[in-house]
Design a protein with these regions (language model features):
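Glycine-rich, charge-decorated loop segments at or immediately adjacent to ligand/cofactor-binding or catalytic sites
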Residues: 35-43
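Accessory alpha-helical/coil subdomains and C-terminal extensions
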Residues: 1-3, 9-28, 44-170
Length: 170
């Protein structure tokens, strides 16, 4: 089976169960995750194409903001509960034909709301549109996810993980 952390956990449970009941069925897991968060790897299958997609999408969003006669603020929330690789890939939008995103916030670093607002005001004072990339898993100093600071409804996925969404909404 090919999959991420939850899939590998399922493979382990199936393998353990097969041993328990004396079955000779063997289960094999091939790790793959776009989060790029598997230990002892340089990069994981799936990450490269996802990173390319993020960079291309961010470039399109940046260009979309250029059509307005007034400055806009666009916050894009990107997957990454505990790993900011995909959000960091938004920096790849920068090139000869694009200035890139203005701000990037990763889950590996505490999110400071006051500092964030200062940076937004600083960029806005220049009279231009901005695009901000935030990971779904950014947290404030007390450990709460940013999305928990707004009116949110808690959902869990099929594996029982709290679905993180709404950081950009906050």
């Amino acid at each position: 089976y090919i999959g991420g952390n939850d899939s590998m956990d399922t493979i382990k449970k199936l393998s353990d169960y097969a041993l328990l009941v004396g079955s000779d069925i063997k289960f094999m897991g091939v790790p793959k995750t776009i989060d790029n968060d598997l230990a002892v790897t340089d990069h994981t299958p799936g990450f490269g194409s996802a990173a390319k997609f993020i960079a291309a999408t961010m470039k399109e969003i940046i260009r979309d903001g250029l059509v307005y006669d007034y400055p806009t603020v666009t916050i894009v929330e990107i997957m990454g509960r505990n790993a900011g690789w995909l959000t960091a890939a938004s920096a790849l939008a920068r090139g000869e034909d694009c200035e890139g995103v203005d701000l990037i916030y990763l889950p590996e670093k505490v999110f400071d709301i006051d500092h964030f607002l200062e940076r937004v005001k600083e960029i806005a004072s220049k009279g231009r549109s901005m695009v901000i990339a935030v990971s779904e898993g950014i947290k404030v100093m007390d450990g709460r996810y940013v999305f928990e600071l707004s009116d949110h409804v808690e959902f869990v996925d099929a594996f029982g993980h709290k679905q993180l969404a709404g950081s950009a909404k906050f």
